[in-house]
Amino acid sequence: MAVFIGATGTDIGKTLFSSLILGKYGKSLGLKYFKPVQTGNDSDRVTLMNLTGLHESYFLKNYYSLSFAGSPHYASELEGVEIDSDELSRHLYSIRDEKIIVEGAGGLLVPLTRKILTLELVRQSEIPLILVAPVSLGAINQTLLAIEAVQNRKIDLKGIYFIGIPDKTTEDNIRTITEWSGVTLLGNFFLNSKEKMSRERFQIECLSRFDQCEVIKKMFV
């Protein structure tokens, strides 16, 4: 089964989360990574390749690759590229039963075009969703709004995964979000800083801490 990795906003941790899944289970489960729309060059795909050390065959080619770092609808307009959301939706629907990590661009309500939001693409594809959420001040409002948008569209939300640098509000943020939403808590991954992560640290420290109860692994088995 494919899983769509979405987030409450930009730079929340989707790419790190995707790296953790692929780095830990890519070889053993035969997982692939796919980012349908990439803005800002091919940075996320390259990040995953560098961190996981996996062969490029584990990384499917972007459907659309745009050099401007911005919302897909705006980046595509600047570069004269027409995003065919219907074709993209059909393609995602066709791979929904394959073992693929599908990473979205930006937050869930980011427009792909002037006519369709990312979340609508997820709904049309019928691929279940994991929501990556922040852990610091402001997380409650952001995350509950995102969950409400997902549930209003009757999308299969598998759970929430929290990523970020913790602060004094973190413990209560996670508790409050899970209590109010009723959505499954899949885990959390706390960072010490925003420093760029090396492959060595990722391989030794991060993979040993990730998904120790194998909750996420079971989605792909």
From Swiss-Prot:
Instruction: State the InterPro entries in the record.
Output: DTB_synth_BioD, P-loop_NTPase
Q: Which residues are involved in binding Mg(2+)?
A: T15, D44, E103
GO CC annotations? cytosol
Active-site feature positions: K35
What cofactor does its activity depend on?
Mg(2+)
Q: Name one GO biological process term.
A: biotin biosynthetic process
Q: Where does ATP bind?
A: D11, I12, G13, K14, T15, L16, D44, E103, G104, A105, G106
Indicate where this protein resides in the cell. Cytoplasm
Ligase as a keyword of this entry, yes or no, is yes
Q: What does this protein do?
A: Catalyzes a mechanistically unusual reaction, the ATP-dependent insertion of CO2 between the N7 and N8 nitrogen atoms of 7,8-diaminopelargonic acid (DAPA, also called 7,8-diammoniononanoate) to form a ureido ring.
What's the protein called, per UniProt?
ATP-dependent dethiobiotin synthetase BioD
Q: Which organism is it from?
A: Leptospira borgpetersenii serovar Hardjo-bovis (strain JB197)
Q: What lineage does UniProt assign to this protein's organism?
A: Bacteria, Pseudomonadati, Spirochaetota, Spirochaetia, Leptospirales
Q: Which gene encodes it?
A: bioD
